[in-house]
Amino acid sequence: MGLNFREKAWILLGILCCSSLICSVKAIVTYDRKAVIINGQRRILLSGSIHYPRSTPEMWPDLIQKAKDGGLDVIQTYVFWNGHEPSPGQYYFEDRYDLVKFIKVVQQAGLYVHLRIGPYVCAEWNFGGFPVWLKYVPGMVFRTDNEPFKAAMQKFTEKIVRMMKEEKLFETQGGPIILSQIENEYGPIEWEIGAPGKAYTKWVAEMAQGLSTGVPWIMCKQDDAPNSIINTCNGFYCENFKPNSDNKPKMWTENWTGWFTEFGGAVPYRPAEDIALSVARFIQNGGSFINYYMYHGGTNFDRTAGEFIATSYDYDAPLDEYGLPREPKYSHLKRLHKVIKLCEPALVSADPTVTSLGDKQEAHVFKSKSSCAAFLSNYNTSSAARVLFGGSTYDLPPWSVSILPDCKTEYYNTAKVQVRTSSIHMKMVPTNTPFSWGSYNEEIPSANDNGTFSQDGLVEQISITRDKTDYFWYLTDITISPDEKFLTGEDPLLTIGSAGHALHVFVNGQLAGTAYGSLEKPKLTFSQKIKLHAGVNKLALLSTAAGLPNVGVHYETWNTGVLGPVTLNGVNSGTWDMTKWKWSYKIGTKGEALSVHTLAGSSTVEWKEGSLVAKKQPLTWYKSTFDSPTGNEPLALDMNTMGKGQMWINGQNIGRHWPAYTARGKCERCSYAGTFTEKKCLSNCGEASQRWYHVPRSWLKPTNNLVIVLEEWGGEPNGISLVKRTAK
């Protein structure tokens, strides 16, 4: 009995899948106008971003296997310079930063790698991936025709390429790396800075080509990429993108599966129907490489998040922050990938013929001697359409594409979701793990304390801390004469200007108030009347960084901390300008200096317990221990009763918490139909931008796990709980 088309198609798909497993064999990687070519075969490549430092090494095999099961061919990752070179010439490639291990795990799964060396990454990552020490190299100007910058970035790029070659990880060596990226979204920066930017683009392309990796280089959002470099598209939609040369394939390096969450912002999400539509439209217009940014977003552990970026980098990705499939997105895209692979022979062999089927409907047909594939599109956002194609009628929902791998049978429609979300809704379930908290109150320093230094005027925060801590103290004394009239009248007004990001003001050891900025407006002004007495008053300003900016120009000019003006209004003489007074400075908190987040450090201070535990007090450390819950479900801390600070598990920093920063925005009913933007579909409005904070299971011991919380604002520790993420 003969095989029908569907049976033949699935056999072909199986052959293609098997061929993708052969990653240990040396292969030649080239390209033409249609596609990337691996060993002489044009390929439609489906890729997903998974950033190795945003998950633990123990999570990597499962994440990559799920990506493979979801129909991906390629794993894409940035290389994170500041994680790998924390000090000049001192390199780190261990634990979450073990890049070689990550790539080998991908290879073992039978997938390819797209390595985005950059080394600028953006990625909502602290300082865009640049090491902070780079800012203080003499003569440094970032990302332009500047010799100190070019020397540093070339040295690091060469270091990474050399490592990859030594481990034989490029495809031409039998490894999985089929593509590399130099720079990142540089086109808009080049346009802004002009001629030096153009010179830098030319230089960086020539430098990359000179490294002889044997695989193609790409530059994303770089319309003037040289002929030897493939320019690619980033965005929510890229069907109208065209490379700058007829001999380059149409590639999409970032199809945004959702959007990042910022502290103070609502949580964005992107409907599965829309992202599937974006992929189908790109393919039907001749696209041959698609990468989902992100396929798994993960977590901004430690202090790796960019300015005001939440600790969760979930991104509404097909695999959620904890590595679990997000439905229906994961399965809906998995089905799409299978159907695209059925169309692959036609897609790589022919250009589409486009035919109108109605006012907002059209057919894109790929036909070769041995294959035919059709994409039927309905761009109407509100009305379904019945279209006639090839002598048959097809019903197309609004804002959708139907795919016919044999030009006859509809195998898939982007708006027809076959997975019921209600049956697999994920939620946080209490583990009933008991906590018994102890507290340690941080001391408020004074201007003459040990460990301080003094100078006239205000200093920029990061130039002193070098981003080794979020915290920096500005200290001075305010001497008030007994004849000041405000002592028997209205309190004076203290006004403080800061470049960001948050500020706690203490007067005579007591919290007088707090101010903080936002991602949109990181600069802040504290303006509040304060209580002063005759004699010497102690003013202590704790400036808090909430990540460093990750996008923009002239990184060397960016500032953080209290830069003024600082004024006191309401004194007898009118206003005192305190900006140029003598100030004392102190780096970090006492608890950090004592390493109270570690087991050894926590034993060096006295913890109050029982009824003496401080509650709703600023600058308080909390300590408890707990046993690991049974099972293997992912775990998180519910921090909804706390304000702002950081958390550690067994000495490892799980990130910044800031549940007291509630989400702005209007969360309204969101339709999949119509052009998507990052502000279209929102959740969590009026609630914490982030309530739950991932606790990796691999960081836990069976018993007696140490949890430490630094609370800046004041919170209720008894409300903290350990929860597990599981299906409803």
Curated annotation (Swiss-Prot):
GO terms for biological process: carbohydrate metabolic process. InterPro entries: BetaGal_gal-bd (IPR048913), Galactose-bd-like_sf (IPR008979), GHD (IPR041392), Gly_Hdrlase_35_cat (IPR031330), Glyco_hydro_35_CS (IPR019801), Glycoside_Hdrlase_35 (IPR001944), Glycoside_hydrolase_SF (IPR017853). Its EC number is 3.2.1.23. It catalyses: Hydrolysis of terminal non-reducing beta-D-galactose residues in beta-D-galactosides. Glycans are attached at N255, N380, N450. One of its GO terms (molecular function) is beta-galactosidase activity. It is found in: Secreted, Extracellular space, Apoplast. Residues 1-27 form the signal peptide. It comes from the Eukaryota. The active site is at E185 (proton donor), E254 (nucleophile). Gene3D superfamilies: Galactose-binding domain-like, Glycosidases. Disulfide bonds: none annotated. Ubiquitous, with higher expression levels in roots and siliques. Belongs to the glycosyl hydrolase 35 family. PANTHER family: BETA-GALACTOSIDASE RELATED (PTHR23421). This is Beta-galactosidase 12.
